[in-house]
């Protein structure tokens, strides 16, 4: 369903058309005069007939003649009292266009129904018509012409002045319908009809019109826009012959059904479109549902009189009209000229036209209202309702929101072209830079979204022009509010600084207008509520206040930390909580580093490899096929990755594993891209691939594949983490480094993508065990460990079978140059360089879940050359960490 604002143009056209077809005040007054004169005259006729029948002694009862009220629930007989049952003329009721308020310009035919006690006869019709002329002359000076139409069971009154109105009085009686029902039920009638009884079908039609009028008043009059749409469609039925058969009762039922089934009130344009949609759907087609007549006891189709061709024509016409409306050409459907795009300001009309009620109800007879009038100032009204009313009035009295900087600039300089200069930052928190050129000067600003960046650019431009940016007034008012809150609550030690610096594009947090555009993060890149919860458990956030209307809410949340209270405000409770937590963090923990703040597990931080004991040597740029690896640029510290691995110590599978992106995922610029195995892994232990002059094995058998604080074989099983016991330490001294090796030009399987870099020799790239554990776990002088894995490529949802055999093999081979056979992330290191061949401390990634076999480097011990194996990565359908995996499959989710 379209937003409501799109229907505004349709509303204007429909209302303009409605105004053009709505009767003038003079026409309505003429109708009202004629109807009221006739009603009073008929009342006098009823009194006269009653006097003749009962004599002058019962004249006093004449005042009790009752016109059934228009909202009567039966056919005029339900409200009659016992003493009125003997009257020949029971009452008169308005029906048709007059009762429903559907009169248009040029509608000259009016209708009334005169209810009789018995079946109306020709004699009664003559008597009423004759006396009616006398009574009309007594009631008014206007001249009326009275005609008798026995065939139609009616009396026709015509006026002699403009407009030439014609009022038809239908004579009928409820007895006609009652007898018909008895006949249909098979009962025999004991009473014979008089010979001059009027046409039964005409009488039944008059009774039906009575039911239609009452149903319409009860159901359609209360629906917003329903009466307006019916009037507009009545005009359409007059102009377009195709729609003619729908005119009258079927059209009224259709409109009420379409508009009444909507889940909310609609404007005139939207309501008209809904009626057209209903017709276009084929409701009137021969195989359609039809339109049920609610005023008949038996199931009756109100459009049963239409033939097949008429039904198809109406449906096709409605579809065409709906198509025109969808393309903004509703004026063609309405038969009018298109309105200008800008609405002219209408002068305030002191007496707005009430389009629902055209003719006020009859005042000839005093009718007791059905409902008690609502007591406006009753004392029994609950105080909560009073409070709500006062609150609503206050909300309405609030001034409209001021323009923001972008709106203000567009008013001053319409048609400015904003250009996207760049987009930086990660996918989950991008930073957009927008620029705009104003009077030859170029302005740039950044923000978490294009919209925010444009707003910041506009602020810069307005500041440069020396104009207000639209944020000052709001900031000052917010400041006053916060000051009042501080005075009212002296216990608040540090109220949250609600940052709303629209005028400073580089502000830490955007303004209210843009706060929801990007996430609210601390300087460590975490959610403030989460970070505060890590430091202080069990904090409770309380809602202090909630202001503003439904479209512009303002929440203030408060949290108490260490006896101090902090507040935050925002457009929803989540944002307010975040700002409150942010205020607490800035006040109580201003300079605490993130890695040391975490109180989840108090463990000593693992020293970084390449520190004082293992000084990192600089390396030249490599020559891997993925492009140069930037070896001396450390990754940004303290960035937490999602999933496996983290800052300093890892969690779960692959502990201590993180690439240059510290995310625990295979970086696109990684050397091998498996768990801590290869050039770019932050925990690259053994077989770290140095492209130029590096050691094939990690120097001096660096312990355990550089597991981040966790030793063990770290075999990666499908279901859980497995750490086998640490072998006994070798008592001897650690082996010296291998000799200088020649540059290796082998393919290091570095798939380089975009701007990603691999940090092979940075302070963060070798997280090994603590220094005391960094001696190689070798049982002999030339010991090495051999890890072999047999992997079944795991199909989608299939079982994985991992078989791993590890051999601790003691050889006597001295330094052999660090030959490395990689099997699914494990390493085979003969010679003194071999630790135990897990490759990475927390998980020798066999790629068991993903099903892959990747063969890594083979380094010849004699020449020191680095021969890279062929890219034999057999990936399953699930992707994985193999070097040949698609870059889009680099992220493995658990």
UniProtKB/Swiss-Prot annotation:
SMART domains to which the protein is assigned, alphabetical: DSRM, DZF
Main location (coarse class): nucleus
Biased composition (Polar residues): 857-866
Phosphoserine: modified positions: 62, 190, 382, 384, 476-477, 482, 792, 810, 812, 816
Residue span, DRBM domain: 398-467, 524-590
Biased segments, Acidic residues type: 60-73
Free-text function comment from the UniProt entry: RNA-binding protein that plays an essential role in the biogenesis of circular RNAs (circRNAs) which are produced by back-splicing circularization of pre-mRNAs. Within the nucleus, promotes circRNAs processing by stabilizing the regulatory elements residing in the flanking introns of the circularized exons. Plays thereby a role in the back-splicing of a subset of circRNAs. As a consequence, participates in a wide range of transcriptional and post-transcriptional processes. Binds to poly-U elements and AU-rich elements (AREs) in the 3'-UTR of target mRNAs.
Protein name: Interleukin enhancer-binding factor 3
Organism: Homo sapiens
